[in-house]
Amino acid sequence: PADLTLSLSQGRLAPGFDREEPEMIAALQRIVAACRTNNIRAALHCGTPDYAARATAWGFDMVTIGGDSRFLAAAAAATVAGFRKLTVSADTKGGY
């Protein structure tokens, strides 16, 4: 989606996922139609579950949601937060 945005908007729009601009949604729908015409599976990388659900409603056969680095960062942050919640009391100072 980021490369498609840059290509179609000639740099006018910043790259990113889950585009809401009518021209980008129309482009995604044209891609689905072209894939259907040529018996090709259409896939789209999405940033959120909501957008992925919309993409399947538009006819995409496969969607991905998020990416490895985001999932790992979120899991690491949740793990550290959980540890801190269990080990730090109100009167405890940091280790450094």
Task: Walk through the language-model features, giving the residues of each.
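Expand to "…catalyze enediolate/carbanion chemistry for C-C bond making/breaking, isomerization
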Residues: 1-96
